Amino acid sequence: MSNEEKSLHISKCLELAILLEVGAEKPGNVNFTSGFKGTRCEHFLASAVAAGPAFQTAAYRGILVAKSKLGICEVGLGQLIKTCAADIKAWQKGGNTILGTIMLFMPVAVAAGMAPTKKNYAFDLSLLRKNIDLAVKSTTALDSVHLYEAVDIANPSGLNDAPDLDVTDPRSKERLIKENVSLYEVFKIASGYDDVCSEWVHNYPVTFDLAYPYLMEQLKSKPLNTAVVHTFLKILSERPDTFIARKVGKEKAQEVSLDAKAVLELGGLETAKGKKSLRQFDKKLRLSKNKCNPGTTADLTAAALALCTLSGYRP
């Protein structure tokens, strides 16, 4: 496999993961049958396609790192995320769709580029995880600035005042450079209230240790939609959604987690009671003008699917 073929392969794996996540009928999220005001499924589908070139570039840079043709500090994760955010905005009109997902995916793309592939073009996930850690810990202050610019481009909701280096404060970018604050350090500040940042800082524990193993076990005996929805519920039941917490408070996020746990305990999509409970849960999440949309849980579900596709899974 040539460098170009490998980087394209990685990009396709990540695009597919986004498409599979979006297509699943997860409660409170946008899917093929339910949307938000101004944001529908087609916006997410367009976003997945638009993200492809940046994923491919990230993977290619990872390949160059492995060949000692590029320093790992020169990968430019922040710039890659910014470019990806701009491409996504140019290709759809539904506002911010997958910023959290591309923040999680970009280090994965670089890490996969750094790793050798097996005969079936799958990746060793233990090595992938080590490479992710190297990539995120090698970020720079310039990566931080570019990430802040990516947030400006995507304009996500739910941004509250941060304890330090607030992304909505124009002065923060100057401080990032002046104080030489790497993107890893920025995410460390935010890791206590944002699970996407927490994944970066703690080497993707929810993705690798909870979501992916559970998803793979589900896929052994269940259809894809059921497996993805159940994985989403499993994550949500154990990790109160930080997107919800930032919008409406930790107490409400905890309540949503308990509801997700109850749906799973009733059998989820495999029993009549579980299906009824899931429908009620979905309706409840949509009542508050989608302020209870488990958006971070969707990002983590997508990350688990990315590990699946990089491991060789195909629908």
Tell me what each language-model feature is:
Residues 92-107, 290-306:
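Conserved phosphate/anionic-ligand binding catalytic regions in large, soluble enzymes, centered on
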Residues 88-95, 99, 112-119:
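Amphipathic alpha-helical interaction segments
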Residues 86, 106-110, 133:
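A broadly conserved amphipathic alpha-helix scaffold signal in soluble, globular proteins
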Residues 78-85, 102-105, 129:
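Generic internal hydrophobic packing segments that stabilize the cores of diverse globular domains
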Residues 1-75, 112-288, 308-315:
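Phosphate-rich cofactor/ligand-interacting catalytic cores and adjacent structured alpha/beta frameworks
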Residues 71-92:
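Active-site cofactor/substrate anionic-group-binding motifs, chiefly glycine-
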Residues 80, 100-104, 147, 224-231, ...:
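Residue-level detector of well-ordered alpha-helical segments, enriched
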